[in-house]
Amino acid sequence: MRFTLSWLMQYLDTDASLDFIISKLSDIGLEVDSVDCKKHLQSFVVVEVIDVVPHHAADKLKVCQVYDGVQTFQVVCGASNVKVGMKSVLAYVGSVIPKNQTVIKVAKLRGVDSYGMLCSRDELGITENDSTDEGIIELSDNTYNVGESFFSCDPVIELNITPNRGDCLGVYGIARDLAAAGVGKLKSVNFCDITFDNTCYISPIEICLEVQGVVKGVYIKGIRNCETPKWLKEYLFSCGVKSISCVVDIINYIMLSFNRPLHIYDADKIAGKLVFRKIDDQIEFFALNDKKYLLGKENIIAVDLANRIHSIVGVIGSEYSKCLFDTENIFLECAWFDPVDIALSSRKIKLSTDSSYRLERFVDPEFLQDGLKLATKMILEYCGGSPSSIVSVQNYVHNDILLNFSPDSVRNIGSVSITRDEIFDFLCNIGCVVKNHDCDIWIVIPPSWRSDLKHSFDLVEEVLRLYGYDKILENPIPISNIEFPDNLHNKLRSVLLSQGMMEVVTWSFTNLEFAKKFGYDSDIMLIDNPINNNMNLMRPSVLLNLLQVISENQAYGNNDAAIFEIGQIYNINSVCGDNNYVVSGVRYGDNLPRNFYKTDRSVDIFDVKSDFFKVLQEMNIGYDSVDLVRSTKSYLHPMKSADVYFNNILIGYFGELHPSIVHLYEIKRPIVCFEVFLYKIPVVDLTRKEFVELRYQSVKRDFAFLVSKNVNIQCLIEVAKKTNVQLIEDVSIFDIYEGNGIDKGMLSVALSVTFRSVDHTLNDQEIKDASDLIISAISKGFNGILRSC
């Protein structure tokens, strides 16, 4: 919401400084986004052209002498419309042109010095929709004075208004809030004094209302849609609103001043009656912004007896019946509709306008008559015309809300002592009607423009807001001497950061179509009201979002990445309070940056296997406590992935992504990933192994077995370990080979076995017996054949 300081002062009687007003706005919850004092526009002044001569060396250039009320400047100009006696706008040397940010300097054009520039509307950033001017701006004699600043240098304040404070989307509402907080007094606007002297006929246009709402209208004939007054143009320009025509600018002014959207129709284009109804079927609509929209059942339209659509109600009017400069007869509409209906209608066509933005945040339903009267009065004043009587149709009744309010609740909730009289004044200042204020329980009726005051504690908040949050004394929380252990998530973050990964935080939403490619087509949680079409599902896996991050990083030229996220996943069985946390990680590209040691390589399954077991290790789960099973997940590579089970419960997986998924995200290199389901892992007590001093020498023996390619290597290792747990200290694989010399379908698996006794040195026979047990177990369990060479 943007407005000027002088605009605010139209409704607020105060001597407060700009700085104080800005500070107070923030104090009462109206966040000040910016304040523009327009110092950069002070160097654009109104001048009179007093002499024009052709340039001696350029046919299209003219040498002009312009007067700013103090001195004369020589300016070289190429505009065809420059002439003696005209008023225009001079940009002094050092000025910055609004359109293109060009800095004006002293220039020599074909040998002639030029001290400034005469500006066009386009260069000043004020091009009007119907403007055909191609030369410099020509100002009317009686509106602008030579020497004055062309732009209003009135400070412009911009506020971020929260959705619940629609009443502050008008300057009058902001002034009302400041006055309630003690900044001056609110100037009254007596709408009842506005009368129509020439009202002597009934509107030829009738209204029919088939939806919930209230519609009022006035037919005005014989208007002259002239140029907008200077002061009104300046107000609109300060708010970033372009001047269209006097009639349109007036209703925009009413909307910005009083948060009261209105709409104007060319009455000659309406066939007899306006019917406000919802659409039965899809239909195309040509809007006044020169765009075409496909309307659906969510949209409310205004149609006439010829079935022509004249507006999407509360959103935008039609190209057919928009008000132009040659329009003579108009129908002025002022309406209130259900905010939900307006929001759905606006969202259907993906168009938000100043009108719909306000209507969907609730506008005052009791201000229709006054808003219509004020707009009509201004149109008659500046454009002339003869108004009809007001035509009105109502399909909604605004009922006052009665709130039982205890003044003691301010102290109980806000921990401040405010007198009953102060509380009474605060509530009255914001427009509330307070009854029974001599009793313990007051009956408070919120004003019609404050739809956010629905409960008694809302009134407490209002009192505290106006009293000042800064006056509430701090009550520091006592610091406890108890030291709490680090949170598990923080420990896991530290572990993965030490693995060279970076943490990311992504949305809890994901794309349904992508999720289906991962096999998530049941037990999923769809979003009825997604923020966009690509985020229409609560994520069943964090992996989907991480892959999107990788894809976007690749698009920006980042070809190596290792990222992780600790977050929640969701399914249809999730209930409020469920903490389905997972740790998910993705590696892509090379494991290290390029270096002269040539230690960089492409990441593989063993990188994420290390990450996975580092997480488990932090949760007191050792490698020997879990079972690895070849993964059956469709989005993982069938030969380079594993599911991990703990106590027969699936607690995660790791592996390389299936090439089809990599292609889906348009990623150029293989990706490895892991995901640990933290919510499935029970708390495992930390068990410390007793230290055993290794006093006796170990012995290593290597074995090479021929086994089928279908053998689970992990199971082979486990079988070898269990043959003699007292003597076998470790079993590891140091080579897997297939190719020349190995039968088809077979593998050569080489094991390194470490033998050690805790109480004596092993002799040859003990080592031989233990080796024979390994050979026998693998032969029986896997049909393994010991290779002789």
UniProtKB/Swiss-Prot annotation:
Reactions mediated catalytically:
tRNA(Phe) + L-phenylalanine + ATP = L-phenylalanyl-tRNA(Phe) + AMP + diphosphate + H(+)
Q: What organism does the record attribute this protein to?
A: Ehrlichia ruminantium (strain Gardel)
Q: Does the keyword Transferase apply?
A: no
Q: Which InterPro entries match?
A: aa-tRNA-synth_II/BPL/LPL, B3/B4_tRNA-bd, DNA-bd_dom_put_sf, Fdx_antiC-bd, Fdx_antiC-bd_sf, NA-bd_OB-fold, Phe-tRNA-ligase_IIc_bsu, Phe-tRNA-ligase_IIc_bsu_bact
Q: Where in the cell is it found?
A: Cytoplasm
State the PANTHER family in the record: PHENYLALANINE--TRNA LIGASE BETA SUBUNIT (PTHR10947:SF0), PHENYLALANYL-TRNA SYNTHETASE BETA CHAIN AND LEUCINE-RICH REPEAT-CONTAINING PROTEIN 47 (PTHR10947)
Required co-factor(s) are: Mg(2+)
Subunit description: Tetramer of two alpha and two beta subunits.
Q: Where does Mg(2+) bind?
A: 452, 458, 461-462
Recorded protein name is Phenylalanine--tRNA ligase beta subunit
What GO biological process terms are annotated to this protein in UniProt? phenylalanyl-tRNA aminoacylation
The Gene Ontology CC terms held by the record are:
phenylalanine-tRNA ligase complex
Family from the record: Belongs to the phenylalanyl-tRNA synthetase beta subunit family. Type 1 subfamily.
One GO molecular function term?
A: magnesium ion binding
State the UniProt keywords alphabetically. Aminoacyl-tRNA synthetase, ATP-binding, Cytoplasm, Ligase, Magnesium, Metal-binding, Nucleotide-binding, Protein biosynthesis, RNA-binding, tRNA-binding
* HAMAP family xrefs: Phe_tRNA_synth_beta1 (MF_00283)
Q: Which residues form the tRNA-binding domain?
A: 38-151
Q: Which NCBIfam families does this UniProt record tie to the protein?
A: pheT_bact, YtpR
What range(s) does the B5 domain occupy? 398-474
- Annotated ranges, domain FDX-ACB: 694-787
E.C. number, please?
A: 6.1.1.20
UniProt-listed Pfam families: B3_4, B5, FDX-ACB, tRNA_bind, tRNA_synthFbeta
- Cite the cofactor comment: Binds 2 magnesium ions per tetramer.
